[in-house]
Swiss-Prot record:
Gene behind the chain: fhs
Enzyme Commission number(s) of this protein: 6.3.4.3
GO MF annotations in UniProt: ATP binding; formate-tetrahydrofolate ligase activity
One Pfam family of this chain: FTHFS
InterPro entries: Formate_THF_ligase (IPR000559), Formate_THF_ligase_CS (IPR020628), P-loop_NTPase (IPR027417)
CDD domains named among the record's database cross-references: FTHFS
Gene Ontology BP, a term: tetrahydrofolate interconversion
Binding annotation for ATP: T65, P66, A67, G68, E69, G70, K71, S72
Family: Belongs to the formate--tetrahydrofolate ligase family.
Taxonomy of the source species: Bacteria, Bacillati, Bacillota, Bacilli, Lactobacillales
Annotated protein name in UniProt: Formate--tetrahydrofolate ligase
Amino acid sequence: MKTDIEIAQSVALKPIAEIVEQVGIGFDDIELYGKYKAKLSFDKIEAVRSQKVGKLILVTAINPTPAGEGKSTMSIGLADALNKIGKKTMIALREPSLGPVMGIKGGAAGGGYAQVLPMEDINLHFTGDMHAITTANNALSALLDNHIHQGNELDIDQRRVIWKRVVDLNDRALRQVIVGLGSPVNGIPREDGFDITVASEIMAILCLATDLSDLKKRLSNIVVAYSRDRKPIYVKDLKIEGALTLILKDAIKPNLVQTIYGTPALVHGGPFANIAHGCNSVLATSTALRLADYVVTEAGFGADLGAEKFLDIKTPNLPTSPDAIVIVATLRALKMHGGVSKEDLSQENVEAVKRGFTNLERHVNNMRQYGVPVVVAINQFTADTESEIATLKTLCSNIDVAVELASVWEDGADGGLELAQTVANVIETQSSNYKRLYNDADTIEEKIKKIVTKIYGGNKVHFGPKAQIQLKEFSDNGWDKMPICMAKTQYSFSDNPNLLGAPTDFDITVREFVPKTGAGFIVALTGDVLTMPGLPKKPAALNMDVLEDGTAIGLF
């Protein structure tokens, strides 16, 4: 069987200018990056703002196994299948981070016959958005350190600089560093650190901004440090929001590519869902909704992370809310949640499916709290048995949720036709009555308690010593009315990655808060979640190479 990259390289791509004609985008509306990639112009984005808004489908998943459950693959396959049954559809996805591509994932543009192309470009440098975000982030760091070095007019306490540098790689050695060493001409020595680019607040801002002026306003509101009298220092105090916006003026434009089946795709922005809000850009999703009748988008990791943040953080910034939520599940993941070891997942185990179903059931019930119709998509693997499939279908029927098998990795659009028809029928026959989980007026503690008890199924929330101090500080600064972005392990409903299934009788501890005042949310750090990942013992990079003719190999 061909690998993902072999399948991708076997496809005869059409020029992107030809692909986007089907959704009313002309040649003058795009800025080409070669023949097969383009950015959408500001003029076109503005021109469609008054157009009718289409139907929005959010794809999410159960708590994943370390290998992932094929959520991006399912999103792409579903969109291709919707187009095949006559629904004018676009996809709005995140763009991959190079760190995980070189680390454990080896690629993140879908898989099999459900991919966005050109996958090598998308997985590597694409149109340079990650570079622009990295540059803007580090320009801010350089200008901040220069301000301190050149007299420190704002009286910044260098011990309380909270802005970190970033790089789009998994590099644990950079988590904690000291800058300014050597001599006085090298600046003021201070502790610093690096995050991965997708954890940068500038990434979150780019993905939530609605236009250039909104981008500039959000950048100006970033808190970078505190003064010696404990007052927050903002980017606007440094007077550099204009320069940062300039660096990002092209990166904010959504990227256009295509699927194997020629479905137009907007791939733009890529914050992680365990340490950030996990959704592609508002600008890409909003624009797609005005160009197509149906838009398929996804949120990172499981529904407890990405979907919750999509619904509580991103949706209020969109012109509409989801009309349906598709929860992707695999039998192997359900068996793992049912207590089966990774080595034994290929063996039939109906009882483990029953035990692990509690994880899927909780996610279904959680999404229903938002008032949105739910469909379960079973991502089919060759090791799945008829007995396991029948058991899962019966369990889904018992909780009155629509369920369909899909084999889009192997069969492309044809493998998702039943799923597409079911999703379309649900949208046409059931109304969505979206409501947020919490209100802006709720306190930080109240918002987190609602997430922990209503979504995670936990009992109590404990706040560590630093978090308790920050609660008062954030309230005094007027930051307590913003949404909450939980930073938590993706593998469990709890903050313990080993607590699988649908655990109960557990507490969540928030150890620290990070104000993301430009993005407009507060990050609550739990467990051992890190904002700079490390590489595994055998990184995916070990299998990558390039042939003499420039052909990439080993990208999954």
